[in-house]
Amino acid sequence: MTGYKLSMTEARTAYNAGDYFAAYEDLMGMDLKESDEDLFKKSRLLGDLQKKNKEYQVFVKRKMYDLALDSLVSGVARYQDNLDEAKTLGIEEEYTKEGDALVQLLQDQYGVSVDDAVSMYRLNREQYSIKIDEIVETWRRNHINP
């Protein structure tokens, strides 16, 4: 089996198993045939959301709540930004499942709505950081030292 075929097989296997980020990593940097471009695009969109969820989990375990919140806010904003592309690629169901998981975490843990997350994501870096810090400080008061 050639390197290309092996990489494509590994990527398809990961994708079909629901490990979209691994599929994306398998395809990243490859000179893809046109017929394989859709798998790359699907893996990129779904993998991005999966990665944000994994980042969130890691940051929470490390008690890095500002970075955890940032992962959710950026993930939810990207979810909204790329929803039309996901529909075009025919992955709306999977994409919505991954995105809704981020939305639920953001709302349940930090009380931040989708609209607020998208608005925050559009702020300049300084304003964004200030907003993240404000939300985390409120969260800490309510969860760590109630």
Question: What residue spans do the PLM features occupy?
Answer:
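Non-cytosolic head/periplasmic domains of membrane-anchored proteins
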Residues: 33-34, 49-146
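Repeat-mediated protein-protein interaction surfaces in helical alpha-solenoids
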Residues: 21-39, 119
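TPR-repeat structural position
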Residues: 16-21, 65-66
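Hydrophobic membrane-insertion alpha-helices, especially the h-region
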Residues: 1-2
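Conserved small-residue packing positions in alpha-helical repeats and bundles
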Residues: 7-15, 24, 44-59
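Canonical tetratricopeptide repeat
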Residues: 7, 40-42, 86
